Amino acid sequence: MGDIRVIGGHLCFVLFLILSGQAFGRGFGPYPHLVVSRSRAAPSNGVRVTYLGTNGYQFESKGHALLVDPYFSRVNLLSVAFGAPIEPNASRINDGLRHLASYPDAILVTHGHFDHLLDVPFIMARTRARLIASTSCVDLAKRAGALPGDPVKPGDVRRIGPWTIRVLPAKHDRLFGKVPFDRPAARVTVPRRAADWNCGEPLAFLIEVNGQRIYIDSGGTPEQLPLIKSGNGRMDLAILGVALPDSRARLNAALERLHPRYILPSHQDNFFRPLNAGFQFGPLTDFSRVQRECAQQNGSRLILLDYFKPWTLPKAAGSKWQNPKRETD
């Protein structure tokens, strides 16, 4: 009976997306002034950030690169909703990799859903990058053909090249009252359907490099973030997934805790559309609310990034945290 209710909920979600999809136009709508980008030249100061779609990012500093949740295949909606087999799209992944560093130091994954982990085994094989994720994610990726990864839990710290990576607890937002695909599928060895890519333990990451601090989650910011003891407790950049109501309800508390110089809302796009179709806000996003919440944060600047258009996170002048100036983008 529970399975029937879950299936019914998924079908309602599909119907909602299909019926509402026409209401969401292409591009950034009334928010193009928030989109930042800079030249593709490697930064001499600061960290270069490239948005890969969904909750995917590349960070670059001092000739090194780090990936988070890279996902280029963009599996279509109906395949996900009706349990059809899904697999990485090699052509789309190769197109995405052309925008990235050849050999990233590591791939961080926030949780095991297909829109975060599906492409990772393919990318690991191409780039020889090391996977850093929860035990459940590492196991899921291995069953999908990846080399053994580095399982981590909240409180762990990894140092790779110039990167210090602190693992933090996170949550996953509910959809119609339930975390989607929240438990392993029974008797599944190799993940083949979207439901096989179960959430596992969600994680967030605090990335420190070149004297800068970046917080990233995929929408699972806890009501109370743990005390971050390193540095001054403030973030240079907070990348916060706010695709669903749960995370939007916690947004103000998260911003009060992080007090970032720059706020980058994430997981805002329609991740069932191919990347070459351009950015489109997802049908469950409420960016106007996100903008209002962020406007209450004194000294923080709200930004958006477009696909594969790098932006350099400026290093704060001097040793003291300063309000970010609005630069010409």
Where are these regions (language model features)?
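Active-site neighborhood of phospho(di)ester-bond hydrolases with catalytic His/Asp-centered motifs
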Residues: 68-69, 103-113, 132-134, 215-220, ...
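Binuclear metal-ion centers of metallo-dependent hydrolases, dominated by the metallo-beta-lactamase
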Residues: 142-145, 149-157, 256, 261-329
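Pre-active-site segment of Zn-dependent metallo-hydrolases
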Residues: 35-40, 64-109, 113, 118-122, ...
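Short, low-complexity, charge-dense intrinsically disordered segments
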Residues: 2-11, 20
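Zn-dependent metallo-beta-lactamase
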Residues: 17-88, 193, 317
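Beta-strand-turn-beta hairpins that frame and shape the catalytic cleft
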Residues: 41-47, 61-66, 157-166, 208-214
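Active-site HxH/HxHxD metal-binding segment of metal-dependent hydrolases
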Residues: 77, 95-158, 163-178
